[in-house]
């Protein structure tokens, strides 16, 4: 239950709605996702977002060249659509009950479940709402906007949507049905800005409202844009209000469908997180399961860092400098993350203990099996020997009659000998009785002799056991000493690697006092020259505190260098921001040049129409004015040649400007890539050094505690 509660608390803080149009994300490859560090990955993604913004501006310029009537804003829609592809590991759900305004702070798209292509209409509409964003082929709006009942219905829908989504709180502007029936210019502007900012929270209104409303509707591909002109936008009341009321209702419909998409994305992401945690709760059966679990842990840690960086960047965009709340959320998330890992470690330890018990049982069974096999082998050998003995006895049974006769003869001889011996025994007994000795006394002496022989055998067996015990103890001591030598050698190698890595980073430290040197000859214990702790660690200070203080001082130096590197990275980020502003200014210049080109093309079209009219008029009078027609044709051809020459020159000029812009963009990309490589190399070096130092500190602390 605690594990499930901790997983549920982690899921409760995951928020899939983490998208800002000012920060388009670039999906990373699978290998880069596994290797990148959680902190530096966010910086790399921010730099990639700047590159993607410039690429999107170029794609917009290409779209203008192909179609003079399309001018796309890079913050809302590009050639690939309004919904940018977002990596599935870049979104978290911190609070499922956030309001819709916070939900629109981001708009991620799952690579596995949802794709930007799913939102494209049949006409390749970049907005992606196929049912209501297709341009209307006619010039007339088919909706009955002049009908009072229809107006009341859509006014009620707009009013309900504004009230349900806290329009008055967000804008500090009162709203009522009367406002929608008798609008003012201010109320229309406020409602339009609020509805559009729900679609694109990163957009900032800077230009005149007439220009911006018309351009934004053009970007959104409002199907009835031909029924609205810029002059009407400056005064929306009166007879023209039904057109703008229908336009506001269209924006409300877009927002409602966007809400539905966001809910779908939220549910998909929650399902994905639940699947991830379900995978973590499953037992590990093989190496592949362990790798999958490791990837899940890395993704959880990356998501925590990305969530923190995204929130901090949004706070920075809002001109706020207090990031303490985001840091507290990051700490709380990591505490839950560590709790999950600890639970997993405890489960693994309990499984290891159970498996060790099973191993001991199996090992005992194997020992018993070995003993049984030895006994079986010995019995088989005895069986073979007994069979050979039986065979030999069968061969000798044929000789037994002769031997029996010999044995009978020998038996008779033995009987005679027994008689003689019996007589001798009686004589000996008589002599013993005369000497005062008895047979019982002699038997007692023999029994004492046998008892002493048994005791001698037992002492010899104990001596053999003691010798074998001494040999096994000596072997164990040699193994322990070899392990001790390997540990000392590994410790010194780690110190050298740590010193080498720090020197590569320009950090010269002294680690000679930390080295451990073994004497050439190790004397047996309990002697004057035996190896002791004082000889192994020759220092005047207490050993744990001395080494701990030295390691802490080295760690503090490394942390100071890390802080310095962070300051340098912040300066690099500021330079990147300046370069981004310069790219945006170049993009606006390119847009103005394209507008000029469209005007020139329009003038060229008018000139050609005039020339064709003159040619048609002269062709009617060809019989009467042949000479004049010939001269007129020459003049017309000359004018056409001049016009084409002018167009060619303008196209060449545009090509030159575009090449200059592409060259500048490529140079800037090279600089940014160089900065990314330097930041990555620096980050990997710092991470490697920090990990090794932590391992060294942990090893030293463990040895000190022992």
Curated annotation (Swiss-Prot):
CC annotations in GO: Ndc80 complex; nucleus
Keywords: Cell cycle, Cell division, Centromere, Chromosome, Coiled coil, Kinetochore, Mitosis, Nucleus
Ion transport among keywords: no
Protein's GO biological process: cell division; mitotic sister chromatid biorientation; protein localization to kinetochore
Location within or outside the cell: Nucleus; Chromosome, Centromere, Kinetochore
Primary role: Acts as a component of the essential kinetochore-associated NDC80 complex, which is required for chromosome segregation and spindle checkpoint activity.
Name used for this protein in its record: Probable kinetochore protein NDC80
Organism encoding this protein: Candida glabrata (strain ATCC 2001 / BCRC 20586 / JCM 3761 / NBRC 0622 / NRRL Y-65 / CBS 138)
């Amino acid at each position: 239950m605690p594990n499930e509660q901790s997983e549920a608390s982690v899921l409760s803080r995951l928020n899939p709605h983490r998208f800002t149009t000012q920060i388009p994300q670039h999906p990373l490859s699978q290998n880069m996702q596994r290797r990148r560090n959680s902190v530096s990955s966010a910086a790399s993604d921010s730099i990639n977002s700047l590159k993607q913004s410039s690429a999107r501006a170029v794609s917009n310029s290409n779209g203008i060249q192909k179609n003079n009537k399309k001018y796309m804003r890079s913050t809302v829609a590009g050639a690939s659509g309004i919904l940018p592809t977002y990596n599935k590991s870049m979104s978290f759900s911190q609070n499922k009950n956030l309001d819709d305004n916070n939900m629109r702070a981001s708009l991620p798209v799952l690579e596995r479940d949802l794709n930007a292509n799913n939102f494209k209409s049949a006409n390749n509409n970049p907005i992606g709402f196929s049912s209501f964003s297709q341009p209307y082929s006619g010039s007339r709006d088919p909706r009955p906007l002049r009908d009072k009942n229809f107006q009341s219905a859509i006014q009620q829908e707009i009013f309900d949507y504004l009230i349900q989504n806290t329009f008055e709180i967000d804008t500090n502007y009162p709203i009522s049905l009367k406002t929608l029936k008798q609008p003012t210019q201010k109320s229309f502007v406020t409602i339009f800005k609020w509805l559009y900012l729900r679609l694109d929270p990163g957009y900032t209104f800077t230009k005149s409202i007439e220009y911006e409303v018309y351009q934004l509707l053009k970007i959104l591909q409002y199907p009835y844009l031909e029924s609205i002109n810029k002059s009407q936008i400056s005064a929306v009341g009166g007879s023209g209000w039904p057109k703008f009321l229908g336009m506001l209702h269209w924006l409300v419909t877009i927002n409602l469908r966007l809400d539905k998409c966001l809910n779908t994305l939220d549910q998909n992401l929650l399902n994905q997180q639940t699947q991830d945690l379900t995978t973590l709760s499953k037992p590990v059966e093989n190496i592949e399961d362990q790798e999958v679990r490791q990837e899940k842990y890395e993704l959880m840690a990356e998501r925590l860092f990305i969530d923190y960086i995204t929130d901090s960047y949004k706070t920075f965009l809002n001109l706020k400098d207090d990031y303490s709340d985001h840091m507290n959320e990051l700490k709380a998330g990591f505490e839950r993350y560590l709790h999950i890992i600890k639970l997993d470690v405890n489960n693994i330890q309990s499984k290891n203990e159970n498996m060790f018990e099973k191993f001991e049982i199996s090992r005992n069974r194997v020992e018993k099996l070995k003993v049984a096999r030895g006994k079986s082998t010995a019995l088989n050998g005895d069986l073979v020997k007994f069979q050979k003995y039986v065979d030999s006895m069968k061969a000798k049974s044929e000789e037994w009659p002769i031997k029996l006769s010999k044995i009978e003869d020998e038996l008779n001889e033995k009987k005679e000998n027994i008689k003689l011996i019996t007589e001798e025994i009686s004589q000996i007994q008589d002599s013993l009785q005369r000497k005062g000795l008895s047979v019982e006394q002699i038997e007692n002496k023999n029994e004492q002799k046998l008892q002493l022989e048994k005791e001698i055998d037992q002492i010899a067996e104990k001596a053999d056991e003691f010798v074998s015990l001494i040999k096994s103890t000596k072997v164990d001591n040699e193994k322990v000493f070899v392990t001790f030598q390997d540990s000392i050698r590994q410790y010194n190698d780690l110190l050298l690697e740590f010193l080498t890595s720090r020197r590569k980073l320009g950090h010269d430290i002294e680690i000679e006092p930390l080295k451990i040197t073994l004497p050439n000859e190790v004397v047996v214990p309990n002697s004057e020259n035996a190896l002791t702790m004082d000889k192994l660690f020759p220092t005047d200070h207490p050993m744990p505190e001395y080494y701990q203080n030295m390691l802490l001082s080295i760690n503090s130096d490394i942390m100071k260098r890390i802080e310095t590197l962070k300051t340098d990275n912040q300066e690099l980020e500021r330079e990147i921001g300046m370069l981004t502003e310069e790219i945006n200014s170049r993009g606006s210049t390119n847009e103005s040049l394209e507008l000029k080109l469209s005007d020139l093309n329009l003038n060229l079209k008018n000139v050609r129409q005039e020339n064709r009219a003159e040619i048609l008029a002269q062709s009617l009078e060809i019989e009467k004015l042949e000479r004049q027609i010939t001269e007129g044709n020459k003049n017309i051809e000359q004018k056409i040649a001049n016009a084409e020459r002018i167009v060619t020159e303008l196209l060449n000029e545009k090509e030159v400007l575009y090449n200059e812009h592409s060259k500048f963009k490529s140079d800037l990309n090279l600089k940014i890539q160089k900065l990314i490589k330097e930041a990555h190399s620096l980050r990997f070096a710092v991470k490697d050094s920090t990990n090794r130092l932590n391992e060294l500190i942990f090893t030293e602390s463990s040895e000190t505690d022992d």
